[in-house]
Amino acid sequence: MPSDKDIKSPAQPKKEEEIPKSILTRISSPPPILNQPDANIIHHPQPQVPQSSLNIPGIKLSPQISTSLENREIVMAGGAYLKERMESPDSLNHKPTLLQPDKSESIPSIDYTLNPPKESQHHKSPSVHAHFYVEETLRPVRNRSRSGSNSNNNLTPITSPQHSEPSSILNKDAIKSQESLRATTNSISSAAASNQSTPRSIISGGGGGGGGANTATSSNSTTSNTALAAQGTTTTTTTTNSNSNTTTTKGEQNSNIDPRLPQDDGKFHVLIGVCGALSVGKVKLIVNKLLEIYTSDKISIQVILTKSSENFLLPETLNVLENVKKVRVWTDIDEWTTWKTRLDPVLHIELRRWADILLVCPLTANTLAKISLGICDNLLTNVIRAWNSSYPILLAPAMDSHSYSSSTTKRQLRLIADDMPWIEVLKPLEKVFGSYGDIGMGGMTDWNEIVNRIVMKLGGYPEDEDEDEADDSKDNIDESAIIDDDDDDDDDDDDDDDDDDDDDDDDDDDEEDPPQQQSTTDNSKDETTNL
């Protein structure tokens, strides 16, 4: 008997009307060829094959897909998984995996759709699918003013209808701050109303005298105290700001906010640039001497500090310069804090326009190289780079002897002397450097000589008022002496005239005397004749 292997099924002809299963799954209705069978198609009878011969191991037959409209079912975009999750009885009690500490921190978007979290969580961007969209809880919006103050920061929380409860929890602090602000404004308005009503009570009292005045003052004090208690720290900050504003308006020295500097104030304007060297302490002596010579009514001094010079300048010295000597001190950061928009003044341009003379003392090798090459990477070098050549610049080098005597330094000094005639380099001194005991050139010029050179550049030493008064008194004395001499001469002339008159009288008397003598002689002759 032949085995199953020997039995071969006859080759079945390929049906032309058979459609692939992939196409059947795509189309919504069966093709017309299935609904309208063609009569020309001949069906060949197939021989009966034993069932055992068709059961070929390893081949699984897939069930036939139904294409009828009645059996079709609408499935959501989430698929069967979402449907099972929605139909499961414990889906309402299901907790997101993000809230369970034992599980992974990641949570699928389906969990967000079914059970959105009560606490706000950060999403980089919402899902592109409509049914996966989770509306984020927005934080309170603040309006920030240009000055950075919090006066206009009225909280306007934005909440979504789905997450109203979490947003209310998040905005609890904002609501408290709003309530405190409202209480403060109400107390201030009530205090203002009471202050306005008290003068009316005093006027209506008529001749109440001192009692009515005392009552009004007491009510004012109580309302002011309540207003201060309600305001709290806000009142403290406002009072400090007002005090700072009043102090800045009194004197010339103020905080480095507005770089617009007065130019036509009738004073000499001296700008001092300070670099990082041990001779920084001499700047205080130079400032004191200049103020002693000219007084603060005739001279105004401002200082520019480089980044390295701040390491050598003591806080006590800086405090004395700013608060006692009323010297405004600028740093590199002020270049950007004073300039915010295009129309704001530029600090290094304002300093260049303000200054009558610039002194760089002490001058390091680093800043010397920047000046010679035109590098401007800080506030001081920006001022020098934009300097008006009609005004002088004095440089007082202070460096090591080997640095000063190097060929690079000589070349830079020669370049400045040839191409920048408005810059004068003061010759350094020979001194002992550091603890090594080296003696060489490179020490900064004596500060008295620097002061003398500044005074000469500004037009010379001013005359003292005492000397002027002494000179005026001497002139007055000399004039009075000259006037007295003139009076004496006039008196002498009068005396001479009197003498001349006396002489004339004598001459007249002499002329009248001879006739009398003749008459007497005639009388004597007559007497003799009578005898």
From Swiss-Prot:
Compositional bias (Basic and acidic residues): 1-20
Domain of life: Eukaryota
GO biological process: coenzyme A biosynthetic process
SUPFAM superfamilies in UniProt: Homo-oligomeric flavin-containing Cys decarboxylases, HFCD (SSF52507)
Gene Ontology molecular function terms on file: FMN binding; phosphopantothenoylcysteine decarboxylase activity
Keyword annotations: Cytoplasm, Nucleus
Cell location: Nucleus; Cytoplasm
Biased composition annotated in UniProt, kind: Polar residues: 155-168
Keyword Nucleus: yes
Region Disordered, annotated ranges: 1-42, 88-127, 139-168, 180-261, 461-531
Bias kind Low complexity: ranges: 183-198, 214-249
Biased composition (Acidic residues): 462-472, 481-514
GO cellular component, one term: nucleus
Function comment: May stimulate expression of certain genes that are periodically expressed during late G1. Also modulates the expression of the ENA1 ATPase.
Stated family: Belongs to the HFCD (homooligomeric flavin containing Cys decarboxylase) superfamily.
Stated name of the protein: Protein SIS2
Species, as recorded: Candida tropicalis
Gene: SIS2
